[in-house]
């Protein structure tokens, strides 16, 4: 009989890509992995714990522009992988490499903290304008025109009524406007 736990998954791929478009598969180096999605936060975040014997921080030319692609599939049945609808394939941006511990002369362990790439643009960009229309049209306007998020990335969009609201946005970050 197989010993199964709720929420088990298969890591299909975890790859690290630097600003020079060089990519390395790091899924075999992972010792811990957490991905967070909250109804109280606007962005997905993740953290990866791994042991590095290749000295990736130096040899892979870390500069703060790295991306990590995480692809996982849920476990369904006995040892079977879920279809693509029930899987996660997401790109994150590395915003912190921390908790560095040297294990021996050639090996170190550390944590990469990751966030949704849109978090950077929404926290950096400020908006000053007057918006008119329904709340959903105002939000979509800001996300598409100012945050440069293509409408194809919206998984779900609900229309709101009435359509005759007016809002003044006084030099707010896009993240504050979303709240």
What are these regions, as identified by a protein language model?
Residues 1-126:
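Assembly/oligomerization scaffold segments
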């Amino acid at each position: 009989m197989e010993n199964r736990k709720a929420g088990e998954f298969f890591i299909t791929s975890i790859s690290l890509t630097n600003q020079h478009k060089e990519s390395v598969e790091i899924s075999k180096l992972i010792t811990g992995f957490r991905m967070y999605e909250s109804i109280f936060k606007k962005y997905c975040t993740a953290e990866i714990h791994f042991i590095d014997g290749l000295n990736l921080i130096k040899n892979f030319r870390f500069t703060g522009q790295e991306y990590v692609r995480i692809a996982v599939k849920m476990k369904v049945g006995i040892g079977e992988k879920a279809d693509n609808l029930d899987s996660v394939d997401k790109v994150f941006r590395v915003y912190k490499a921390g908790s560095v511990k040297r294990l021996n002369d050639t090996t170190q362990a550390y944590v990469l903290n990751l966030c949704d790439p849109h978090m950077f643009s929404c926290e950096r960009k400020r908006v000053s304008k007057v918006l008119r229309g329904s709340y959903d049209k105002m939000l979509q306007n800001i996300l598409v025109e100012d945050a440069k998020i293509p409408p194809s990335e919206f998984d779900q969009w609900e229309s709101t009524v009435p359509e005759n609201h007016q809002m003044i946005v006084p030099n707010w970050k896009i993240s504050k406007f979303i709240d």
